[in-house]
Amino acid sequence: DITRAMIAEARRRHPQDAARFAVGKLPPGRVDYAVFSGTFNLCLIDDPDRWQRYILDALAACWPRCRHGMALNLLCRRETTIEASIFYAVEADMTAALRRFGRVEAAPTRGLKHDVTFLVTR
């Protein structure tokens, strides 16, 4: 995770696995899966195309360290946009962009309006 407080809480709740939680933009080594939960929703710029490129670049940097795949969730609408500092992707466009990494499955996240979970596997 990139948030020190989240890592501290994970280590507190799971002390037997504390060494498995780290702060950083990339996993510290090879992992089975990388999970990005809400990581890319808050956006501090006002250029949705640039933010989407940032997301794909971040995933591209992480992909070589993933043995099996990556999972992420994004808010999705009919148009790629940023509204009130929240990024919204177009599900079909994001699915197509993620195919450069591998097989992509996308599904609405139950109980969360506009939220879509993407699973990318090798």
PLM region spans:
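Class I SAM-dependent methyltransferase SAM/SAH-binding core
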Residues: 1-27
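Conserved acidic residues
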Residues: 31-32, 68
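A short SAM/SAH-binding and catalytic strip from SAM-dependent methyltransferases
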Residues: 33-52
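Short "lid" loop at the C-terminus of a central beta-strand within the Rossmann-like core
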Residues: 40-42, 75-80
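A short glycine-rich, Lys/Arg-flanked "PGG" loop and its adjoining helix->strand segment in the class I
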Residues: 52-69
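Class I S-adenosyl-L-methionine
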Residues: 81-122
